[in-house]
UniProtKB/Swiss-Prot annotation:
PROSITE patterns: RNA_POL_BETA (PS01166). Belongs to the RNA polymerase beta chain family. CDD domains: RNA_pol_B_RPB2 (cd00653). The lineage of its organism: Bacteria, Bacillati, Bacillota, Clostridia, Eubacteriales. Residues 1084-1115 are annotated as: Disordered. Residues 1088-1115 have a biased composition (Acidic residues). GO terms for biological process: DNA-templated transcription. This is DNA-directed RNA polymerase subunit beta. GO terms for cellular component: DNA-directed RNA polymerase complex.
Length: 1115
């Protein structure tokens, strides 16, 4: 039934029936291999393409010979700390040849710092960890289409798409004429282009295409007689208005399609063309040839005669991946070509005798191109670091968006839909919900990328009905030709199929065939899904929509204080944690010399020592806590590749995103209405779902026009009680507990000089500068935040730290919070069963089992049937049995425990086979009427925490334009009282409430100050004034040339004043600065949907770290 399997240091009992024939590849090799290719091959290709650069006379020649990468200046951790880029200097060996004198100069030229990939497959850019997402684009090649004209006639098209260069399109009309469009211009008869290629006479053309009737029809429309006329005709279409000559026409056509500098099919385009058109053009010819054009037209004629078939552009054989290496190469190419222009110009301007390669080469465009790519490309994303699975998935993400890809608005249904060629290549489940659905996917578990950028899936070869252990990787095109059996087809011991008819896939169809007809067999049942999906047990019993939510929500699980691997797993947990890079691995066999919370020292068998420093309480990109702890003891033997320290969300080397909790499916007093969750106080007390969150705050002392700012403990008008936790520098001490409004870094800024009286000037003269006016601009804990100070970092110019221009000192303070689970937090299981905590109840009031154990979570049974995610019920049953047996189980996707296995395991554990039991009401002790399903389910706490969302405003900033309060937590905004809310007040005649909401609480600038004054002084609240929006309305009408005036009831004109003097005075007295809105100046009005940083950004890691560039870096 089930058997033990060793995963890391732990045993899991697996229900799998299918032997694994192929180990899963390293899960982040898609990133690493691509970047390695770039360093080894990609750069070399770029320099080879651009070299040699000649000046316009051909006298000076600049050649790039070789390049090398130096050592990075700082280690990865130090780069994060100092906010610098993890990069190594790129040096290029350049040779300058003067052909007149024969003089040769060689020099090594520095070409800027090149960002390096870390061992985890990420980049550190300006101290932030980023990931370059792979892009799915249309492959270069030739594509055929057919559609039906409104008249009912079939019309055909063919398009030759290069990697870069002009498109060549053939199309037919209703009368079977064939036309050609060159580079999206007006169409010409196709024979004109063929004639221009050198097939001058009608006879030659007819012979070339075996006297095809469509060609004959087209020739009748063609009014050119010779190759020269044809060239001129094409030139007229491409360059209307310029006088055509045969020579200029010939060189234009040459440049468009036959010049390697202007037209590039790339290696993959040549491969696709040769394969599609059965050509044997050499693979290093990356431009079009005459044969290509003729063959592509010939193929289209075949299609018109009813043979062959049109291409499906959503097929993965026609879409390829651009990974990091290629994206970088394209960016580098842009930089180099800009540099090439500069070099050419400098060759002509400068004196030939004193010229050196160093003088010619300007590296700025190259550096700027790379910087721009990493800093602001759509595909360079701020890494989602919520937990290890989120990191791993982000690195394996495939996006159809980005430069050269699709846009959300233009992408239709077909592009987003699941396609049969996705099988084993791209996960059909894991994709975001929302506008990006189907445009962003995830690489399947066993998928790999071939040198052409196509995704390959592995299959076992089948010979005459016998399955071998030979593994072939097939691209989507190759797979179309074969019949592929499922991984779970029953086999005999020697690998023959048992059944007489086998289920198989052939292209888009499912077939039932004899064993001899089978060509290949799947290597594993989980090869069609991604990592996140493969972590869902009983996936086969869940509806796809809920599985999608389950896969996405696992990536939002917060790392908990105490981790606990699931009782019911899928066997993928170990591999996912190991490859995510958050754990520490032993590099060689050896013995542990020392294992402390700080570091682990291992003595290898060859006698060398290796020290692994552990990461302690660092802040992740998402503010969760990164902490590593050793799981080996002193003198323990370790093997190469063994996990020796756990990272966040891992438990003994296994991914552990949540906790195993005892749940019951029952309603309870309406507290689990609409997916709400009722939990026991035990989960709070025993820190089941407590997580650590670390926030970073920074203060910098700059040079201002009035003098430098100063970080100091000496702050004006602040009592000693406020300064108690600051050290002598004015920076908070580590370990201090702080809450809203406390000073973290004391800082003063010089105020503008005021007119001094004679006495003050005398004091100044005697006591020097001391009496200068400064104002308090200290860094304080923001509204709603609190915690303990865990780290303080100080960077100064004197210590040689690299700081932004104008900054003299930078202080970073890290505040950690322990967040217990609370009402309003979002929780979820792995099956898309999500909900919000509605009540935390005393342990003694929870329903309890016959043996007295109180239930920990109560879920609504109505959440199951309509959602069709029965996997959660199966997991609950099996979890109960696992707990009773004291085992951890693995039920791999599509190859896990069957219903009978679950019942058998429950029996073995001595539990009722139904998985149900009598529960008793904790308040009365009475049994509930019916038996209730109870058991252990793995439940996660998600990164949508109520502490981050709850928000209240008293007095805050107003928008400069409308003078109304801003919106959203990030802006410390107010709650919008909208149209419908106004109706509600109108309906009940609440006139005064309505009046103050529309005036003093909103945009009546004068009234707000007077009201504040009245409240402070304890007087009655005065009449409100005119709201700003009313003034704006009048101004708008006046700007349309309408004479609008405001009259009172007795027809007297009312003067609408601007903010008057006494208001400004009052404001000053009350300490309200009207011009610098409280508490922070207004930056902008947030657009709709972006009103704060917490709108559900379930997908695509948000780029919340804007990049800064110096102007001179950009060209």
């Amino acid at each position: 039934m089930f058997y033990p399997v060793k995963v890391g240091t732990r045993e899991r009992w697996s229900y799998s029936r299918i032997r694994e024939v192929l180990d899963m590849p390293n899960l982040i090799e898609i990133q690493q291999n691509s970047y390695q290719w770039f360093l080894d091959e990609g750069l070399r290709e770029m320099f080879r393409d651009i070299s040699p650069i000649q000046d316009f006379t051909g006298n000076l020649v600049l050649e790039f010979i070789d390049y090398s990468l130096g050592e990075p200046k700082y280690e990865v951790e130090e780069c994060k700390e100092r906010d610098v880029t993890y990069a190594a200097p790129l040096r290029v060996k350049v040779r300058l040849i003067n052909k007149e004198t024969g003089e040769v100069k060689e020099q090594e030229v520095f070409m800027g710092d090149f960002p390096l990939m870390t061992t985890k497959g990420t980049f550190i850019i300006n101290g932030a960890e980023r990931v370059i997402v792979s892009q799915l684009v249309r492959s270069p090649g030739v594509y055929y289409s057919e559609s039906i004209d409104p008249s009912g006639k079939k019309v055909f098209g063919a398009t030759v798409i290069p990697n870069r260069g002009a498109w060549l399109e053939f199309e037919t009309d209703v009368n079977d004429n064939i036309f050609v469009r060159v580079d999206r211009t007006r169409k010409l008869p196709a024979t004109v282009l063929i004639r221009a290629l050198g097939y001058a006479t009608n006879g030659q053309i007819a012979e070339l295409f075996d006297d095809n009737e469509h060609i004959r029809i087209t020739l009748e429309r063609d009014n050119t007689e010779s190759a020269e006329e044809a060239l001129v005709e094409i030139y007229k279409r491409l360059r209307p208005g310029e006088p055509p000559t045969v020579d200029s026409a010939r060189s234009l056509l040459e440049a468009l399609f036959f010049d390697p500098k202007r037209y590039d099919l790339a290696k993959v385009g040549r491969y696709k063309l040769n394969k599609k058109l059965n050509l044997s053009v050499p693979t290093d010819v990356h431009h079009l040839t005459k044969e290509d054009i003729v063959a592509s037209l010939r193929q289209m004629l075949t299609l018109m005669s009813g043979e062959g078939h049109k291409d499906d552009i959503d097929h993965l054989g026609n879409r390829r991946l651009r990974s990091v290496g290629e994206l970088l190469q394209n960016q580098f190419r842009i930089g180099l070509s800009r540099m090439e222009r500069v070099v050419r110009e400098r060759m002509t301007i400068q004196d030939v005798d004193v010229i050196t390669p160093q003088v010619l080469i300007n590296i700025r465009p190259v550096v700027a191109a790379i910087k721009e790519f990493f800093g602001s490309s759509q595909l360079s994303q701020f890494m989602d670091q919520t937990n290890p699975l989120a990191e791993l998935t982000h690195k394996r993400r495939l996006s159809a968006l980005g430069p050269g890809g699709l846009s959300r608005e233009r992408a239709g249904f077909e592009v987003r839909d699941v396609h049969h060629s996705h099988y084993g290549r791209m996960c059909p489940i894991e994709t975001p919900e929302g506008p990006n659905i189907g445009l962003i996917g995830s690489l399947s578990t066993y998928g790999r990328i071939n040198p052409y950028g196509f995704i390959e899936a592995p299959y076992r070869k089948v010979n005459n009905g016998q399955v071998t252990d030979q593994i072939d990787y097939l691209t989507a095109d190759e797979e179309e030709k074969f019949v592929v059996a499922q991984a779970n087809a029953p086999l005999t011991d020697d690998g023959h199929f048992i059944e007489e008819k086998i289920d198989g896939r052939h292209g888009p169809d499912f077939v039932l065939v004899a064993p001899e007809r089978i060509d290949y067999m799947d290597v594993s049942p989980k090869q069609m899904v991604s990592i996140a999906t493969a972590l869902i047990p009983f996936l086969e019993h869940d509806d796809a929509n809920r599985a999608l939510m389950g896969a996405n929500m696992q990536r939002q699980a917060v790392p908990l204080l105490r981790t606990d691997a699931p009782y019911v797993g899928t066997g993928m947990e170990y591999k996912a944690a190991k490859d995510s890079g958050v754990c520490v691995l032993a590099s060689k066999d050896g013995t542990v010399e020392r294992a402390t919370a700080e570091d682990i020292i291992i003595r290898h068998d060859d006698g060398t020592l290796e020290k692994h420093k552990l990461l302690k309480y660092l802040r992740s990109n998402q503010g969760t806590c990164i902490n590593q702890r050793p799981i080996v003891m002193k003198n323990e033997r370790v093997e190469a590749g063994q996990i020796i320290a756990d990272g966040p969300s891992t438990d003994h080397g296994e991914l552990a995103l949540g906790r195993n909790v005892l749940i019951a499916f029952m309603t309870w007093e309406g507290y689990n209405y609409e997916d709400a969750i009722l939990i026991s106080e035990k989960l709070v007390k025993e820190d089941y779902y407590t997580s650590i969150h670390i926030e970073e705050y920074e203060a910098d002392a700059r040079d201002t026009k009035l003098g430098p700012e100063e970080i100091t403990r000496d702050i004006p008008n602040v009592g000693e009680d406020v300064l108690k936790d600051l050290d002598e520098r004015g920076i908070i001490r580590i370990g201090a507990e702080v809450s809203t409004g406390d000073i973290l870094v004391g800082k003063v800024t010089p105020k503008g000089e005021t007119e001094l009286t004679a006495e003050e000037r005398l004091l100044r003269a005697i006591f020097g500068e001391k009496a200068r006016e400064v104002r308090d601009t200290s860094l304080r804990v923001p509204h709603g935040e609190a915690g303990k100070i865990v780290d303080v970092k100080v960077f100064t110019r004197e210590n040689g730290d690299e700081l932004a221009p104008g900054v003299n000192e930078l202080v970073r303070v890290y505040i950690a919070q322990k967040r217990k689970i609370s009402v309003g937090d979002k929780m979820a299981g792995r099956h898309g069963n999500k909900g919000v905590i509605s009540r935390i109840m005393k342990q003694e009031d929870m329903p309890f089992l016959p043996d007295g154990t109180p239930v920990e979570i109560v879920l609504n049974p109505l959440g199951v049937p309509s959602r069709m995610n029965i996997g959660q019920v199966m997991e609950t049953h099996l979890g109960w049995a696992a707990k009773a047996l004291g085992l951890r189980l693995a039920t791999p996707v599509f190859d896990g425990a069957q219903e009978e296995d679950v019942f058998a395991t429950l029996r073995k554990a001595g539990l009722p086979e139904t998985g149900k039991t009598v529960l008793y009401d904790g308040r009365t002790g009475d049994p509930f009427d019916n038996k209730i399903t109870v058991g252990y389910m793995y439940f996660l706490k998600l990164h949508h925490l109520v502490d981050d969302k709850i928000h209240a405003r008293s007095t805050g900033p107003y928008s400069l334009v409308t003078q109304q309060p801003l919106g959203g937590k990030a802006q410390f905004g107010g709650q919008r009282f909208g149209e419908m809310e106004v109706w509600a007040l109108e309906a009940y005649g609440a006139a005064y409430t309505l009046q103050e909401i529309l005036t003093v609480k909103s945009d009546d600038v004068v009234g707000r100050v007077k009201t504040y004054e009245a409240i402070v002084k304890g007087e009655n609240i005065p009449e409100p004034g005119v709201p700003e929006s009313f003034k704006v309305l009048i101004k708008e009408l006046q700007s349309l040339g309408l004479d609008v005036r405001v009259l009172s009831e007795n027809d007297e004109e009312i003067e609408i004043r601007e903010i008057d003097e006494d208001v400004t005075e009052t404001a000053k007295e009350l300490g309200i600065d009207l011009h610098e809105d409280l508490p922070a100046p207004v930056i902008h009005e947030a657009g709709e949907g972006e009103d704060d940083e917490y709108f559900e950004e379930d997908e695509e890691a948000v780029d919340d770290e804007p990049m800064t560039f110096d102007d001179d870096d950009m060209e």
